[in-house]
Amino acid sequence: LKKKWEMDYITKDTLKGWVVLNEKRAGRKDSKFDTNFRNAGYASIHRGVYYYSYAKTTSDAKKEARHCLKLLKEQGIDPTDLDLPVAFDIEEEAVFQTGRRNVTAVTTTFCDEIKKAGFEPMVYSGASALRNYFEYSKIREYKIWVAHYTKASAPAIPFSYDMWQYTSRAVINGANTGMGYCDLNYYLVDKNYKE
C-alpha cells in the first residue's frame, strides 16, 4: 500500500508544528515540497523533512542520504532552517525482509550521513516494524517517530520515542491533502521547552 502525502497552507493557530514531507518516489522530489516548505515558514509552522526509503543495503542508504542532502542544498535549506529533524522513513516490506541486522545497518548508515552534514536525524517506522526489524540498542541515539493507530494512550513499543503518529484519518480545516485526511502526531518535548 503506497501513501501519497501533501500539504497546503494551515495557520499556526490551527497547528503548532508540522513536518514538511519530502517523499522519494523513483528518485523524484515531492512536487509540492517547495511550496509546502515555504508556506510553512511564512506561517511560522515548525518545519522538518522526511525521506521515504527503498534502501536494502548500506550502500543504497548512503546514496539516499546524499540524495536527501542534495535536495536540501538545492533548496537552500541548512540545519538552522529546520525546527524538526530529517526523518528516515523506512517501511517497505522488501527492506524488512532483509533482516533485523541489515535494516538496522541501513538505518544507521542513513542517519549517520545526515548527522555528519549537521542535520538532526530521526527514524520513522510503524510500531510493529520497530519492534521486529530494528536493533534498538543501535538506533536509540536517534530520535524515534513511531506510527501506531490505536485507541491506547501510547504506541505499543517497549522503548522510548520522540514522536507518535496516532492517526491517518484526521480532518483539519485548511489542510488540502487531496485525500481528505491528514496524519496527526504528538511530538514529545521537555516540559521546560520554551518556543
Residue ranges and their predicted role:
Residues 1-111, 115-117:
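Substrate-binding cleft of extracellular glycoside hydrolase catalytic domains
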Residues 2-5, 137-195:
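Functionally critical loop-and-helix segments that line ligand-binding/catalytic clefts
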Residues 47, 120-121, 144:
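Hydrophobic anchor at the start of a short beta-strand
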Residues 51, 125, 148:
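Short beta-strand/turn micro-motifs composed of small residues
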Residues 60-63, 129-139:
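Glycine-rich, charge-decorated loop segments at or immediately adjacent to ligand/cofactor-binding or catalytic sites
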Residues 93, 128-130, 151, 168:
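Short, solvent-exposed loop/turn segments at secondary-structure junctions
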Residues 114-132:
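Aromatic-lined carbohydrate-recognition surfaces of secreted/lumenal glycan-active proteins
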